């Protein structure tokens, strides 16, 4: 593997000194870029794009050609794991992901097998190894998965949900069934992420997109407990250096201390959290990633630059901050505004790293 030319992102996650704050964007390979839309049209549909390792590599690299980003993130989807479990993933126009065979009964859960990441998910591993090779040491490659709770919401609900009625009914009326599902998912995700590291991922992120839908105690029981199980089982050293792990619960500002206790290296923050407060609470234990409101990218460029300055000042001096949005970039954002955001982070952050 080529030697890493820019390791700023990995160093910040491990709270090692950096010359400026590293930056990348969730969904940086996505629909706001015209070149992404062209490649997706070439693939035919979203899952065909994910399953073609050459095209998945192409869209992963597209934002790096435009912007001076400090990391690449594998182009894939969190629902690859349940899809590999045989649920029949498909996408309804305007409705998002759906499953032909939801796992909403204990019998369905018992029948689920844990997918072999090199077999049923081999197309993801081929994409990881292709991207790592093509990056040629330019920046680190982030691998990722959804959290067990978040994957389970789609599997039990049969797709996206605003109320989470079915999975919450299972959580409170049939907790043993849900725990069986979450346990299988934790094992599946651990294998999946370790296979990504074996194929070239240099950092890992667990996206708990729907953890914030849970009550204070239910979050620990149904989400955090299973992310902890994954963190305990991950490969944390490869290619002669540490493989940092970031946990991100959207709506998880209440639970930063508990998340920091898992042994992860960093926490992702959504835009509702005050980064200065987060650093006071958990900055002695973990690095922090975030956390500009993605909608701020619709603002005039001077306002974006002002917001970047406020977040950098909120975090303050020293390492341990990876700048990002508080969630994925919106599809209608002007690519020039995204570029101005990235430049502003680099230009304004040097003063905090003297």
UniProtKB/Swiss-Prot annotation:
Keyword match Transport: no
As recorded in Swiss-Prot or TrEMBL, the protein's gene is named hemE
Q: One MF term from GO for this chain?
A: uroporphyrinogen decarboxylase activity
> Positions of the site: Transition state stabilizer?
77
- Quaternary state and interactors: Homodimer.
Under Enzyme Commission nomenclature, its number is: 4.1.1.37
Q: What is its main location?
A: cytoplasm
Q: Enumerate the subcellular locations listed in this protein's record, separating them with semicolons.
A: Cytoplasm
Q: Name one GO biological process term.
A: protoporphyrinogen IX biosynthetic process from glutamate
**UniProt KW keywords:** Cytoplasm, Decarboxylase, Lyase, Porphyrin biosynthesis
What is this protein's record name? Uroporphyrinogen decarboxylase
Q: What is one GO cellular-component annotation here?
A: cytosol
Q: Which residues bind substrate?
A: 27-31, 46, 77, 154, 209, 327
General function of this protein: Catalyzes the decarboxylation of four acetate groups of uroporphyrinogen-III to yield coproporphyrinogen-III.
Q: What class of enzyme is it?
A: lyase
Q: Pfam families attached here?
A: URO-D
| Pathway linked to the protein | Porphyrin-containing compound metabolism; protoporphyrin-IX biosynthesis; coproporphyrinogen-III from 5-aminolevulinate: step 4/4
Under the heading HAMAP family, the entry gives: URO_D
Q: Which organism is it from?
A: Shewanella oneidensis (strain ATCC 700550 / JCM 31522 / CIP 106686 / LMG 19005 / NCIMB 14063 / MR-1)
Catalyzed chemical reaction(s): uroporphyrinogen III + 4 H(+) = coproporphyrinogen III + 4 CO2
* Signal peptide bounds: none
Instruction: Name the protein family.
Output: Belongs to the uroporphyrinogen decarboxylase family.
